[in-house]
């Protein structure tokens, strides 16, 4: 390296935790469903340089599972909440979103349908503009990518 040459600093790769219902993404064998909305969103984020963490394994149990989720939420720059009829009745999604709110994580709600939020965390999400993905896939992806670029520090 010659004198005076400035090396680029390694850029922090943005990391998001995906809070979702497995029923929206995985089949009964825990394999991703082809062409699922969740898969499309995950691929779009990854394709734009975002490190994505979502639980697709059913190998965790009880207390250990809670610790894995909590550690990954805390390690993320933001939480992308994939709101759907199924995720809004999920006990685990409720815990993830409530934990994220309690720990002041940036939350980006993405509405896969027009289901109202679970009352366990609806108040914590009030005032946060949701990406209304169900109104149009391309516009939804673009808004999510714009939101993640602006909100994730």
Pin down the residues of each PLM region.
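Short low-complexity, flexible loop/linker segments enriched in glycine and/or proline
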Residues: 67-71, 96-97, 123-126
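Conserved N-terminal substructure of TIR/SEFIR domains
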Residues: 1-81, 101-106, 112-115, 139-153
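Conserved TIR/SEFIR loop-to-helix hotspot centered on a Trp-containing motif
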Residues: 61, 85-105, 117-119
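Short amphipathic alpha-helical segments
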Residues: 14-16, 126-129
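Generic anion/oxyanion-binding catalytic loop in active/binding sites
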Residues: 27, 89, 133
